[in-house]
Amino acid sequence: MSGRAKQGGKARAKAKSRSFRAGLQFPVGRVHRLLRQGNYAERIGAGTPVYLAAVLEYLTAEILELAGNAARDNKKTRIIPRHLQLAIRNDEELNKLLGRVTIAQGGVLPNIQAVLLPKKTESHHKSQTK
């Protein structure tokens, strides 16, 4: 024997969250805990909370991007509920998904019925044909 003592075993690796491993911002561990506590099923697979967190993160990012565009169109730098309402109702798929959802302080979409708009005059058109 060389008489030299071992320098110790492997150091414990720094803990990595499941959100970090999946490359997500949404908390996979919290989603898993909520699925278990909600009694949705007797058993919850390991991939289920990852998938659900990814779906929630995608939908949130999509809505926030459209709401940010609506805020920028209104020359604002802060997203308010009105911008969320405009973003969701102007997007066909999001409107279908969130059709029965009421957004507090969201207002309504501006919409004027075609019959209420002023009639186009024919006098301008007739003068050009002569």
Curated annotation (Swiss-Prot):
Residue positions, PTM N6-crotonyllysine: 119-120, 126
Tissues showing expression: Testis.
Compartments (UniProt record): Nucleus; Chromosome
SUPFAM superfamilies: Histone-fold
PTM-bearing positions, type Phosphothreonine: 121
Post-translational modification summary for this protein: Deiminated on Arg-4 in granulocytes upon calcium entry.
Motif [ST]-Q motif boundaries: 127-128
Modified residues (Symmetric dimethylarginine): 4
Positions of modified residues (N6-acetyllysine): 6, 10
Domain of life (superkingdom): Eukaryota
SMART domains registered for this protein in UniProt: H2A (SM00414)
Keywords: Acetylation, Chromosome, Citrullination, DNA-binding, Hydroxylation, Isopeptide bond, Methylation, Nucleosome core, Nucleus, Phosphoprotein, Ubl conjugation
Gene Ontology CC entries for this record: female germ cell nucleus; nucleosome; nucleus
Any single GO BP term: heterochromatin formation
Residues bearing PTM N6-glutaryllysine: 96, 119-120, 126
Residues with the N6-lactoyllysine modification: 10
Modified residues (N5-methylglutamine): 105
InterPro entries found in the cross-reference section: Histone-fold, Histone_H2A, Histone_H2A/H2B/H3, Histone_H2A_C, Histone_H2A_CS
Modified residues (Phosphoserine): 2
Subunit structure: The nucleosome is a histone octamer containing two molecules each of H2A, H2B, H3 and H4 assembled in one H3-H4 heterotetramer and two H2A-H2B heterodimers. The octamer wraps approximately 147 bp of DNA.
Sequence similarity: Belongs to the histone H2A family.
Role this protein plays: Core component of nucleosome. Nucleosomes wrap and compact DNA into chromatin, limiting DNA accessibility to the cellular machineries which require DNA as a template. Histones thereby play a central role in transcription regulation, DNA repair, DNA replication and chromosomal stability. DNA accessibility is regulated via a complex set of post-translational modifications of histones, also called histone code, and nucleosome remodeling.
Record's protein name: Histone H2A type 4
Native species: Rattus norvegicus
